[in-house]
Each structure stands twice: as C-alpha cells, then as structure tokens.
Amino acid sequence: MKLIRTVAAVAAGCYLVAATVLALVGLHDHAAPADVIVVPGNTVRPDGTPSERLGARLDAAVSLFNERLAPTIFVSGGVGEEGHDEAAAMARYLVAHGVPASAIVQDPLGFDTAATAANVATYLRTNKLHSALVATQYFHVARTTLALERHGVSVTGSRHARYVEGRDMYSLAREVIGYTLYLATL
C-alpha cells in the first residue's frame, strides 16, 4: 500500500510540474518576425460570432499583425457543433477589426491542433515560406508550437490570448496529456 501511495504522489508531482511548465511557457510572450500568424480555431457561437475565448486569440493575432510581425494571419478550424465554419467566422472577425481580407488565409480543415499544424506546413511549403507566430490560449501554446515544429515549421514566438475562465484549469490539465501524446506520436 505504501508503494502505491508513493507512486501516486510521484505521479501527481510530475503532473503538477508539467502543468506549471506548460503554463509558464504559454504565459511568456515573445515574438520575432515570421511569415504567418497561426490562430487555431475554437468555439463559434450559434449566431456565427467567435466565443470570447476565440475572440481573445484573434485579438492577440491582430496585435501581432499591427506590430508588423507577420504579413498574414492563418486562421484554422473546422465546422463546430454550432454548424459554423470556424475559419470563416475568424476571418470575418479579423476584417471587422481592421485586418485586410487579403492578409487572411482560411483553413476550414483544422479540426484539431495536429491538422492545423499540418495545414500550416503545407501552406508555407507551397508558398516557399517557413516561419510562424502562434496566437492562442496560454495553456495551448506549447502543444501548438510542438505540432508546428514537428511539421517542419520554424516558430518564432507566441502571444497568449488575454482571456481567463474557470475551465482553464481543466484545459491546462488536459494539455499535459495532449502535449505528452504529441511528444510520443508526432
């Protein structure tokens, strides 16, 4: 019984350390010029507008774009439960916030982080480009960066979305598992 408690305590400690590292990585904004800014999709409301969480990701991308750190914003997402194309909703939001439509690339096939990374890599290779900035929630930065790098994309930095909600603790815990799986499989 003592061995089980010891193993459980060590496992819990490792999990907490991993969650802390992922959070700190995501909260450390740094950005250098890149070819594109990547914004992974998230919930779109039933009325077709981005959720507050997704809007915060897009606001981070607009900030990077306005700082002229990349000439293009790559928005990626699938069709969510609400029946809306996340990439199209994100593009509309960006245009409404001053980003020219010509500076937006829509990827409607970004059903998850791995698919988004693969699609970004294909876009960059096709256009003889190679680098990206990441704009997403702090807990998602490390896994998004890992996925992009595993697909050959040079990630020059990130900016986390300035939006916090109660489910972030669940999301951070989930990211520990997701990051570990990506390390093992991508």
Language-model segments: which ranges?
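N-terminal membrane-anchoring alpha-helices
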Residues: 1-35
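Hydrophobic alpha-helical segments, especially transmembrane helices
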Residues: 3-6, 58, 175
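Intrinsically disordered, low-complexity N-terminal regions enriched in serine/proline/glycine
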Residues: 14, 92, 178-181
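A structural signal for short, hydrophobic/glycine-enriched beta-strand patches
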Residues: 23-173
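A transmembrane-helix-recognition feature enriched in membrane-embedded lipid enzymes
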Residues: 168-186
